[in-house]
């Protein structure tokens, strides 16, 4: 049975970054994720400026940076806009497929062991170690386990159990997001979205209790919608023919 100082469940940006810093300090780290990288993630792909605090990321911008956003427009339900322009970037545009995979590579380059394509089934905290069982039947031990797999990872479930919190998330507490990215070319992006790469958000489009977005990359446009799962279920109950994918296309 392989033993690690730390096992990180989830190799997204949070998990990969934790694995990177731990491995850099000489820790033996296992980075476990149910997906195989590179993989897509439903997301607008905008990084807040606090990303500048991570030296290993900003020193390698060329590995994944798509564009810098200097302007944002937020539209209300009736399309009334609030326009904001900044002299400095107020967020950075990336594509999750490339960004997440790059962060995993940084962690592996520092010595972390990537275990991909298999999910954590369960784990048990003992006095001297943590025993983690994977879905493929393998067992790993570690001194510490970190949960970075999102709302449904095994660590977050255990915390909810210990704290006597509900074991199941309510539909109104979980968001459903749909997006797509379309290649439109740099000439189009420069002409329509400008060098400031204006990005837009639309609150309560057609009274949907959520928002839509349009984030402009280098040559790609990322468009999506997001809202609580409870809203999606209600819309489908009221109209069985309602389809969220068609809704996204209509929004575009």
Predicted segments — roles?
Residues 1-14:
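Beta1/beta-strand and adjacent pyrophosphate-binding region of the FAD-binding site
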Residues 14, 37, 152:
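Conserved Rossmann-like nucleotide-cofactor binding loop
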